């Protein structure tokens, strides 16, 4: 990943966090890492933990296509690790925030 991609990712996550706060989410953690992968944002709303993947681009393609089964499996393993590490067993869902040209699309409870 180049430096520009890295900073674009941070910018996208910043925008996603602001969006989530306005929607009433409580932000728990950003960039949770494990040996299995990374969760961009962990947030909570209405008693449910939300593990949120953020995709940001200014290019002309469908960014949701960048989340495939391989990436989703890494996210699921990282969620399991998060639950074990923190000793919790709360209900959760996986969400996707796509940001393209400053337009935010929030896809809740995604699955493949």
Give residue spans per PLM region:
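Hydrophobic "anchor" residues on beta-strands that sit immediately upstream
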Residues: 26, 49-51, 91
């Amino acid at each position: 990943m180049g430096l520009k991609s890295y900073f674009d990712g941070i910018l996208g996550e910043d925008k996603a966090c602001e969006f989530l706060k306005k929607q009433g989410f409580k932000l728990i953690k950003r960039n949770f890492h494990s040996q299995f992968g990374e969760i961009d944002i962990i947030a909570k709303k209405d008693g449910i933990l939300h593990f949120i993947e953020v995709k940001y681009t200014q290019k002309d393609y469908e960014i949701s296509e960048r989340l495939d089964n391989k990436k989703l499996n890494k996210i699921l393993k990282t969620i399991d690790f998060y639950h074990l590490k923190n000793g919790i067993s709360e209900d959760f869902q996986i969400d996707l925030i796509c940001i393209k040209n400053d337009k935010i699309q929030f896809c809740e409870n995604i699955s493949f």
